[in-house]
């Protein structure tokens, strides 16, 4: 059964969503992320994708207190991302209670660093953030596009045991038009050793059911939940 992973994106300590990664298209949903996390846990959900959007912009961890407060108040298994660049950033995140971290831009800019993290912290703790824009990897909160394809990116980390990857199609994110099913099908067939987590575009329950039928490991649900298109009860049925 597919893993349901709700997303909480943080700016100024508050729960927000961006459209297509654009900081100018920001909508605030809740002033207290801990309450949102508790709501997920109360519904039977076990995981959380927590993104420090301030950190992604500043290229260093910013909202670690929110992470700390969520892991203190819930038993959710949290993966944390956004601007993680250094060993010290990872230490802060893990000390604050993160079960996993997502390495995004740093995997493109400094692959040796992420290879080192896989060796040092173990493959269960590191998720590769593969954000694609027209087939190429987007970095720094999707403000820039690199000259790497997703296949080239993955091949840099497979020898180091990478097991988890969140793949976001930036063109789909926040638009509620459905995920990039063809992309996930291709990646799932091409890289069978990777637990793929689909992100971006989920608009209704049928999208999650289709990803589940395709054998995708996990799905991140954001705007569809916050806009009331998918209920907590519907999400929780996958964890039954």
Curated annotation (Swiss-Prot):
Pathway involvement of the protein, from the record: Amino-acid biosynthesis; L-histidine biosynthesis; L-histidine from 5-phospho-alpha-D-ribose 1-diphosphate: step 4/9
EC number: 5.3.1.16
GO biological process: L-histidine biosynthetic process; L-tryptophan biosynthetic process
EC class: isomerase
Coarse class of the protein's main subcellular location: cytoplasm
One Pfam family hit: His_biosynth
Name assigned to this protein: 1-(5-phosphoribosyl)-5-[(5-phosphoribosylamino)methylideneamino] imidazole-4-carboxamide isomerase
This protein's encoding gene: hisA
